[in-house]
């Protein structure tokens, strides 16, 4: 029995299983090793009208309220929209509710060369950012269904575009100021609340993101079963609870328990995440806040924060400012906006390894200016770092290859006597000073690095639209001509030929067909990831061939 080969096959199988399980968890689905399966999201509203938009459940002792349209309310689809734009971002704000109902990323283009849209409010897709007021015993306050009028707009003294919208109901006036900084995906949203007439009820400002449960279409056959999956859904951050993703399935089942009240002075934010991009409300931390989430309608969900404004004296005003981020998950940029916001770029469980790997990849790119060559150079550096371990593994394989004829003879000699065969093999390993498991440890140690690099390449928006050479115009999508996956399959086949042939015929066939199985999967993986794998395989082949030469054995044919 070839112990080393068996262990290696078990390690690679377990690694593949764990990697697939990580995809499932990252996508918001339960782990294969525990928990009930996720329920299928309900079908979206397809009646042709946008889904209903109700006010949120108030927290901190304030009962739930259900908003009914009033004389000061208007359907979103029939209202005027106002546009703010800088060189990176174009947003539309509706007069109904003063909600952000459309956001285009002008520098991030789709396959048909149109700007990527984050926020949208159409009959088939709902994804908006909204805010408003609630209070005990008074549901008729300015909220996300109220009709807002334009007070003023233009550019401030620094040339920044802005607009001010206001609405007054039941003695409370809410003014919303939207302002865009140049070269920024960050929208300043100021809420100016004025108590016009006496009203003793404490006021609460809510800022929330509403989205349907639709996800990105997977590429490939069988519903994209072999394509790389990423998480789509809400995420929250508090100074105490740190970063947490919330699946739509958990909201559907009421499994998510929001953190307790965030004290004044402590950071916190809520976000909606998708592959490469995100939106986030970041309220001012000067006032206490509460995080909430919930299901609004059929396949329509929300996550938000409620800021406690307290009781406002008649004739006085309270300001509650917030930032609304809408843009790509560029780690360095996110770090400058709010504490913990860089966690929107999710590296999975091995963040502690993935972060320095991306740091190194980024610095290589700053030198060579091409992400494809950066991946290749990073792979070379990682290979050099693990050279001593890899060399030990390949030396062990080479020694095993030398004794293959003797192993075959033993198998024939002790046919039908497995116990004696194992004893004879162990005695031979002892005399030849061969550790049959010597090639396993180096492989096991390198697995976390491979998984970390996988998440770096999968989650980095910098790869989106980044070309390499010739036919590779975008490292974030599969190779359009499948050249890299074919090269990868060939390189894996060559590697199996360089390794000692397992004495077990079944095991030998498994090793022979493994490149084909892996290739089917990698046909639909991002080209950047396949490029890493191909480079790693070619370097491994060169290293193993050289070690085989040093041991005086030519690769098997």
Curated annotation (Swiss-Prot):
It is found in: Cell inner membrane. It is a multi-pass membrane protein. The chain crosses the membrane at residues 6-26, 219-239, 367-387, 437-457, 514-534. Disulfide bonds: none annotated. GO terms for biological process: protein insertion into membrane; protein transport. Keywords: Cell inner membrane, Cell membrane, Chaperone, Membrane, Protein transport, Transmembrane, Transmembrane helix, Transport. The keyword Transmembrane helix applies. Belongs to the OXA1/ALB3/YidC family. Type 1 subfamily. PANTHER family: CYTOCHROME C OXIDASE ASSEMBLY PROTEIN COX18, MITOCHONDRIAL, OXA1. Interacts with the Sec translocase complex via SecD. Specifically interacts with transmembrane segments of nascent integral membrane proteins during membrane integration. This is Membrane protein insertase YidC.
